[in-house]
Amino acid sequence: MARSVYLASVDRDAVKSIVAVGLIEELKRSYERVGVFRPVLRRADGRDHVLDLLKTRDTIEADREVREGTTYKHFDEAPDAAMQLVLDRYEAFKKLCDVVVVVGSDHTDVPGGEELSLNARIAANLGTPMLVVLPGSRLTPAQLIASAELATKTIEAKHASVIGVVANRCPTTTIAAVRAALGKLDVATAAVP
């Protein structure tokens, strides 16, 4: 059975795709078959610049259709059918992999805090723990802790679990303080420039 991790962010400024690249590269040191799956896409025509980037980094030879779940529109119109389609496609894709990096949606089509909730619901249904990526470039250490705690509550309310928190794009002037603050959380943490 494939191992997996679900990357999600609290907003688009977190730039989780950079974290995904680093995670994929690290996983390739330990696993032969590392794959990337996108459960929610903005467009039905298959254009997704994040997936296009990340599939060049993984080790799975598979068409993009195998790596995709469904669209925001499908979730809006038929949420149960959309979730089932994501589950079916994920189950088929993970058979090709030793480990799957699931890269959540990009805060483009779901209003407010609903996007993290959607990602948490998907992660819970996939049985995949979540790695939360925070925007370290514009939040103070105290704000990052508050954001991490709120994200964790939101995720756990949807019956998913958090295995770690990453503050991405932290200024070098605050990175030590961010690391110290995040270190108080009960999950693995990292702060990266």
Question: What is each model feature region?
Answer:
Residues 1-18, 122-123, 133, 153-158:
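Extended hydrophobic/aromatic-rich secondary-structure runs
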Residues 2-96, 111-112, 141:
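N-terminal phosphate/diphosphate-binding loop that engages ATP/GTP or pyrophosphate donors
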Residues 8, 166, 193:
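Residues in well-ordered beta-strands of folded domains
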Residues 33, 96-102, 129:
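Loop/turn-to-beta-strand initiation segments
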Residues 36, 191-192:
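A structural preference for short, hydrophobic beta-strand core positions in alpha/beta folds
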Residues 105-189:
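Conserved catalytic-core segment of NTP-binding enzymes
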